């Protein structure tokens, strides 16, 4: 089950709802 909590500011949510590093340093 996906818990709807905020990701860290530099993370993004992937298609599975996981917080993934790092939205400012990749594609």
Swiss-Prot record:
Q: Which domain of life is it from?
A: Eukaryota
Main location class: secreted
Whether Protease counts among this entry's keywords is: no
The record's family statement is: Belongs to the sea anemone BBH family.
| UniProt protein name | Toxin Bcg III 21.00
Q: Name one GO molecular function term.
A: potassium channel regulator activity
Primary role: Possible voltage-gated potassium channel (Kv) blocker.
Key words, A-Z: Ion channel impairing toxin, Nematocyst, Potassium channel impairing toxin, Secreted, Toxin, Voltage-gated potassium channel impairing toxin
> What GO cellular-component annotations does this UniProt entry give?
extracellular region; nematocyst
The cellular location(s) given in this protein's UniProt record come to: Secreted; Nematocyst
